[in-house]
């Protein structure tokens, strides 16, 4: 052979035991049949490493921590040859929670732990159980039946969910006629064979303690370390080119007999969701600021804006302070956040004023203590739910009240405002907008790249948004003007639409469509019987609104959501008769970047969270329940769903949703904004380029196994900055909103 050659040439498949670095593979390079020194590299340092050289040979060593396809590259001058190694990772078996610190955090030792932070492991439940006895292990390994007679089924998660990497392990919840269990077996395996693990767990000891919310073994988390390995493995490329999906199998044992397994198959997006979700919380335990108001057990009540970062097991306080029992001046709830994550606008309670919720404050999220940066705007009643540009340099104001009883708005027309230089100076200057004179915009929202504005045209309607159309206008940042206003949607007669949110590539808009008004509010709310669904339409073509059926819970044969009492579809009565949990979704917002080839929508839902949050949908007023009792936890929570990009008009690009981990179980949570965190400087630890000020997250020169922010790169990896697709290392990537985005394997 006259050219450069790397041997072995074919696909190499190796079986690796978790935690081991064997077997290794030796590669050699020749030119015209003679050894030649080349530069060696691998594409995924989490899978393996190669001695870099230059040398005529290298040894590829698996990390023992992740399975999947590893690409080995040999470069000589301008010529590069690639070879592939498929690593099949054996995760082994375990019996009971291990001593791994991540699993110890998922093990409850007291009843009080069940209601702290986001619950055990950030997802609720009673945590991992201990070891299973020998006879029950046999029952789990040789089940007496498949569980169909006992009606064994999953309540949560949902089949066909798309998960990102880096999230907390979900809480597996099941239902069956036995109503209790002695032990369970969980099995995780990828469809390609890149990973396999099996674990058995006895009934958690906390279920036998006084004060436990239940005595039944009806839910269990997946061990966090196992989940991280499984999701870091699934979602990659495979030898046959098919998606590497993740299957979960559950077998349940009671009375010496096992039943099952029941199974689900999920997809995993090959990316982490970085950034922070900022959201409203009514009933948070992090502050107390409702004046002289307590819950049914005498706890003072708090309302604040909280934040959750990927991997957190509980939220952190962002804006809001304790002021009870004397006053409610510490309350901060209604808010908007700039998509690049730098600034937040919030409204404050003003007890002495004729109207409440009229004062607006700007907060710098780049500060370690955002509350200390509060700048009060000189114009009250102007900035509630305004639309901010990605860098928060300008805001376009909203004219719709947050609710009929929450008069935060004093203006009837909208305007574009500058915040001064720098933002936070408090100098407000109204600017000409180029939109129709006197326009009143409801629920306005800028596209992540600031090129478009969507809003509900509420001009002249006062506080009633019924029948108001939804418009989109182009925006020119250079001149701060709008143009080309188009109506993209008009809701069915007698209903309302709102909360438009652009996809990261500006290709479509998601929004909330009212299904049934609660009869007392003239604007869109999430309370007192208001029912809504999330819809979308594709821009650039004849708009065709479509319900996101997979997101709201509608499958090919109807709703796939679990049903239950308390007006959750099983025994609905009165005005709730005929409705189910597929009409309990509200307030969508979208992560401003593409991750793993998907867009990601955050929304409020009052659906059942398996068998963990099962109260009546509207029972989220903190005065009506015990804020320290997980069995009374309201269903008003934040959920996340993946959205396909490049979907044709009229199709459903959504996937089943998952519960956002780390929310306080006993609080009612809503209006989540998933935005990028303030960027990190070069040399700072990172997970992806969208976290870095210069856009690159590269191996640390002094410690190649670690990643740090950088200002240089040969090309851009997924979630690193780009101007065109040609900047991306993978030529199949797109350049969306300034970052390289992969395309999911179909």
At which residue positions do the language-model features occur?
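Short glycine-aromatic motifs
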Residues: 4, 43-53, 441, 690, ...
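Low-complexity, Gly/Pro
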Residues: 6, 12-20, 27, 31, ...
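Secreted, cysteine-rich disulfide-bonded mini-domains of extracellular proteins
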Residues: 679-746
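Sequence signature of WD/YWTD-type beta-propeller architectures
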Residues: 91-682, 710, 741-745
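Extracytoplasmic soluble-region selector
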Residues: 1-112, 179-183, 189, 743
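Surface-exposed loop/turn positions
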Residues: 20-25, 68-70, 161, 167, ...
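Extracellular/luminal Pro/Thr/Ser-rich low-complexity repeat and linker "mucin-like" segments
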Residues: 12-28, 110-112, 166-170, 291, ...
């Amino acid at each position: 052979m006259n050219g450069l050659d790397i041997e072995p040439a074919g696909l190499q498949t190796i079986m690796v035991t978790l935690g081991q670095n064997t077997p290794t593979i030796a590669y050699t390079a020749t030119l015209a049949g003679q050894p030649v020194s080349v530069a060696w590299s691998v594409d995924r340092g989490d899978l393996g490493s190669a001695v870099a050289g230059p040398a005529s040979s290298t040894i590829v060593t698996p990390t023992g921590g992740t399975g999947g396809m590893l690409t080995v590259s040999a470069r000589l001058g301008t010529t590069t040859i690639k070879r592939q190694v498929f690593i099949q990772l054996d995760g082994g078996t375990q019996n009971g929670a291990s001593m791994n610190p991540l699993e110890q955090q998922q093990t409850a030792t007291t009843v009080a732990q069940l209601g702290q932070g986001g619950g055990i492991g950030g997802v609720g439940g009673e945590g991992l159980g201990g070891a299973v006895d020998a006879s029950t292990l046999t029952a789990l390994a040789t089940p007496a039946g498949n569980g169909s007679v006992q009606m064994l089924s999953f309540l949560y998660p949902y089949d066909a969910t798309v998960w990102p990497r880096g999230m907390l392990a979900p809480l597996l919840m099941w239902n069956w006629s036995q109503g209790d269990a002695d032990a369970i077996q969980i099995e995780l395996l990828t469809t390609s064979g890149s990973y396999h693990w099996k674990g058995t767990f006895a009934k958690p000891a906390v279920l036998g303690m006084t004060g436990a919310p239940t005595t039944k073994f009806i839910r269990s988390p997946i061990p966090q370390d196992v989940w991280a390995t499984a999701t870091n493995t699934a979602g990659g490329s495979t030898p046959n080119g098919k998606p590497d999906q993740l299957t979960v199998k559950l077998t349940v044992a009671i009375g010496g007999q096992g039943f099952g397994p029941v199974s689900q198959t999920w997809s995993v997006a090959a990316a982490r969701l970085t950034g922070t979700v900022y959201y409203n919380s009514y009933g948070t335990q992090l502050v107390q600021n409702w004046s002289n108001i307590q819950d049914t057990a005498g706890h003072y009540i708090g309302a604040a804006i909280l934040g959750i970062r990927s991997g957190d097991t509980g939220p952190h306080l962002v804006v809001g302070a304790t002021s009870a029992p004397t006053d409610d001046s510490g309350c901060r709830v209604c808010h908007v956040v700039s998509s690049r994550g730098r600034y937040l606008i919030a409204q404050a309670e003003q007890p002495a004023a004729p109207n409440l919720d009229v004062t607006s404050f700007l907060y710098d999220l780049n500060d370690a203590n955002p509350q200390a940066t509060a700048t009060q705007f000189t114009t009250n009643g102007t900035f509630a739910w305004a639309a901010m540009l990605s860098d928060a340099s300008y805001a376009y104001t909203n004219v719709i009240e947050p609710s009929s009883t929450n008069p935060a708005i004093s203006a009837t027309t909208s305007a574009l405002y500058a915040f001064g230089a720098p933002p936070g100076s408090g100098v407000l200057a109204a600017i000409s907008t180029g939109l129709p004179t006197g326009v009143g915009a409801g629920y306005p929202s800028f596209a992540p790249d600031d090129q478009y504005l969507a809003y509900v045209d509420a001009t002249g309607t006062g506080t009633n948004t019924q029948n108001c159309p939804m418009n989109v206008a182009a925006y020119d940042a250079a001149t701060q003007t709008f143009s080309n206003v188009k109506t993209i949607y008009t809701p069915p007669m007698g209903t309302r639409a709102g909360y438009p949110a652009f996809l990261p590539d500006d290709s479509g808009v998601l929004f909330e469509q009212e299904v049934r008004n609660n009869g007392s509010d003239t604007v869109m709310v999430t309370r007192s019987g208001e029912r809504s669904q999330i819809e979308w339409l594709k821009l650039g073509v004849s708009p065709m609104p479509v319900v996101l059926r997979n997101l709201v819970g509608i499958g090919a044969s109807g709703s796939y959501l679990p049903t239950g009492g308390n007006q959750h579809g099983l025994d609905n009565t009165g005005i709730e008769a005929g409705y189910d949990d597929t009409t309990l979704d509200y307030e969508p917002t979208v992560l401003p970047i593409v991750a793993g080839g998907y867009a990601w929508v955050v929304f409020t839902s009052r659906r059942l969270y398996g068998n963990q949050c099962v109260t009546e949908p509207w029972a989220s007023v903190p005065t009506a329940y015990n804020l320290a009792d997980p069995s009374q936890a309201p269903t008003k929570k934040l959920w996340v769903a993946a959205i396909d990009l490049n979907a044709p008009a009229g199709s459903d690009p959504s996937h089943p949703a998952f519960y956002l981990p780390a929310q306080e179980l006993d609080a009612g949570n809503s209006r989540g904004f998933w935005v990028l965190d303030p960027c990190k400087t070069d040399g700072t630890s990172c997970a992806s380029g969208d976290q870095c000020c210069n856009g690159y997250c590269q191996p640390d020169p002094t410690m190649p196994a670690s990643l740090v922010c950088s200002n240089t790169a040969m090309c851009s990896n997924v979630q690193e900055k780009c101007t065109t697709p040609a900047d991306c290392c993978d030529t199949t990537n797109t350049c969306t909103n300034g970052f390289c985005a992969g395309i999911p394997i179909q």
